[in-house]
Amino acid sequence: MAQHRVVLLPGDGIGPEITAVARQLLEAVSQRHGFELCFDGQLIGGSAIDACGEPLPASTLDACKAADAVLLAAIGSPRFDNLPRDKRPETGLLGLRSGMALFANLRPVKIVPALIGASSLRPEVIEGVDLMVVRELTGGIYFGQPKGRIQADGEERGFNTMTYSSSEVDRIARVAFDLARERRGNLCSVDKANVLDVSQLWRDRVDAMAPAYSDVEVSHMYVDNAAMQLVRSPRQFDVLLTGNLFGDILSDEAAMLTGSIGMLPSASLGSDCPGLFEPVHGSAPDIAGQDKANPMAMVLSAAMMLRIGLKQTEAAADLEAAVDKVLAAGFRTGDLMAEGCTALGCRAMGDALLKAL
């Protein structure tokens, strides 16, 4: 029997509640498909600060690096807003990504038929949307040097540097090409090559890699047009490849096509390391401990972990099918509630998902 080591990071707010739901479903689906998941719970974020004074204990990072996959729930709490920036819960996530050498962020956006009315766009625009945003995580303007604020010519000036090396572009492009090959074979690379030298390099490197993926259709789109097309005609996209800044913006725009951030999973990947899988939503401290949380993004993140991180594709499909079945049956948590549907709390939704398996 195959064994997989999975680190669970419940984190803060609603994190422990949605982690409990995901764990029970993972245990059930692993038994059905004949593999074993060995779970290791670790601290991160505010819960780690409370326990040991640091948002990312060394023991947590060591455990994550030694695992086969990491499943994170949520990080953050306003209780820690008065701390120095480098001591806040969110720093734990940044340190985890850096320590695990994760450079590729994957954000799938897929319209669930039962929730098509939740989107602010017309059904005929978003019906059938199934796209993946692949965002580079460790380069670009967020990390480029030099950066800072200085006094110059009698006034204050702020500056940042947008920079990418050819190797940085190549490794994220390879992730996107591989995904496009597994999906529908269409890759759209997003840049601003008409005005930015760094984007011209980006486009050149993508074009240089394209011949090795002759089965993938490659196109390029300026970021401003991509932002417009995501709203105008999102079905045209399969895999979107972006740099750090553009991906940060476009992935959030794409997320809202679904109408609820409570349904969106994500993955962060490196070259030779475990993947980190987490919901897009935050820790929602205002509803923590009240059995109101929507666990579905966490469950779908667990499905991504099974498919991408552990190569258990049939088990992943079972989890995704359970989510579809429950929604089609009219069960909803409060954030998705609509007329004619049945309201469930977090634990009851977990039970419904378990039954749907």
Swiss-Prot record:
Binding site for NAD(+): G282, S283, A284, P285, D286, I287, A288, G289, Q290, D291, K292, A293, N294
Residues that hold substrate according to the record: R97, R107, R135, D224
Enzymatic reactions: (2R,3S)-3-isopropylmalate + NAD(+) = 4-methyl-2-oxopentanoate + CO2 + NADH
Listed pathway(s): Amino-acid biosynthesis; L-leucine biosynthesis; L-leucine from 3-methyl-2-oxobutanoate: step 3/4
EC nos: 1.1.1.85
Enzyme class: oxidoreductase
The record's free-text note on cofactor binding: Binds 1 Mg(2+) or Mn(2+) ion per subunit.
GO cellular component assignments: cytosol
S-S pairs: none
Iron-sulfur among keywords: no
Gene Ontology terms: biological process: L-leucine biosynthetic process
Binding site for Mg(2+): D224, D248, D252
Site feature location: Important for catalysis: Y142, K192
Cofactor list: Mg(2+); Mn(2+)
Annotated TM spans: none
Coiled-coil stretches: none
Subcellular location: Cytoplasm
Entry keywords, A to Z: Amino-acid biosynthesis, Branched-chain amino acid biosynthesis, Cytoplasm, Leucine biosynthesis, Magnesium, Manganese, Metal-binding, NAD, Oxidoreductase
UniProt record similarity statement: Belongs to the isocitrate and isopropylmalate dehydrogenases family. LeuB type 1 subfamily.
HAMAP family found in the cross-reference section: LeuB_type1 (MF_01033)
Described purpose of this protein according to its UniProt entry: Catalyzes the oxidation of 3-carboxy-2-hydroxy-4-methylpentanoate (3-isopropylmalate) to 3-carboxy-4-methyl-2-oxopentanoate. The product decarboxylates to 4-methyl-2 oxopentanoate.
Protein name (Swiss-Prot/TrEMBL): 3-isopropylmalate dehydrogenase
